[in-house]
């Protein structure tokens, strides 16, 4: 497992489970006119009227807009007072996990802490890219690790990459914030040396803390 796998375990939550989703939809007897014919007729009408082109253009614009500026993570406030706590990344496994040689090192049903098997050698920063004070705070940071990631909860990805001269990520649907219990930003996540916990810090943007 690499750090990428560790991030996946952090995202999945306390219980990693798999389920058979079964078959989607219901089966109906064929009726006249059949559904395919109705769909084709509708598409033809849309194309002839020009509505198809307008809908496709609107769809493309929406996809581009959401990829550059995804919807903000709801429920995230602004850090006003420093605070910190420990986070236990342990998960319950839904299946055996094997190493590169196929040997099982963690079995289904066991509670596993990823930090037992791979160190968390990176620092995660969560900020609101629409807050100039938080962007300025991010520019002052000196990560204690060789690898770090800037994760937006709000803001424009390309604008922040240009402003911070760094690759920037976005917490789509607030998955990481929910998993790590982050409800305010700026926030920083790092490993606790020699321990099996992560440290989550909430740091006011105006504070000089690094």
Swiss-Prot record:
It comes from the Bacteria. InterPro entries: TraW, TraW_N_dom. It comes from Escherichia coli (strain K12). It is found in: Periplasm. NCBIfam families: PRK13738.1, TraW. Disruption phenotype: No F pili expressed on cell surface. This is Protein TraW. Transmembrane segments: none annotated. The keyword GTP-binding does not apply. One of its GO terms (cellular component) is periplasmic space. The keyword Lipoprotein does not apply. Its main location: periplasm. Residues 1-18 form the signal peptide. Involved in F-pilus assembly. Required for F plasmid conjugative transfer. It holds the Pfam family TraW_N. Keywords: Conjugation, Periplasm, Plasmid, Signal.
């Amino acid at each position: 497992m690499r750090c990428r796998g560790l991030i996946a375990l952090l995202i999945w939550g306390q219980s990693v489970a798999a389920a058979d989703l079964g078959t989607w939809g219901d089966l109906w007897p064929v009726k006249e006119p059949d559904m395919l014919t109705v769909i084709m007729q509708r598409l033809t009408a849309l194309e002839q009227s020009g509505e198809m082109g307008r809908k496709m253009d609107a769809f493309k614009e929406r996809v581009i807009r959401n990829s550059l500026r995804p919807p903000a993570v709801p429920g995230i406030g602004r850090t006003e007072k420093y605070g910190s706590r420990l986070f236990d990344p342990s998960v319950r496994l839904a299946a055996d996990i094997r190493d590169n040689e196929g040997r099982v090192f963690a079995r289904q049903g066991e509670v596993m802490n990823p930090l037992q098997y791979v160190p968390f050698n990176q620092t995660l920063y969560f900020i609101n890219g629409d807050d100039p004070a938080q962007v300025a705070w991010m520019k002052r940071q000196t990560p204690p690790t060789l690898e770090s990631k800037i994760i937006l909860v709000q803001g424009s990805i390309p604008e922040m990459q240009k402003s911070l001269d760094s690759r920037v990520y976005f917490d789509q649907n607030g998955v990481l914030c929910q998993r790590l219990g982050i409800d305010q930003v700026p926030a920083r996540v790092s490993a606790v040396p020699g321990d099996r916990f992560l440290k989550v810090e909430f740091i006011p943007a105006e504070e000089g803390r690094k």
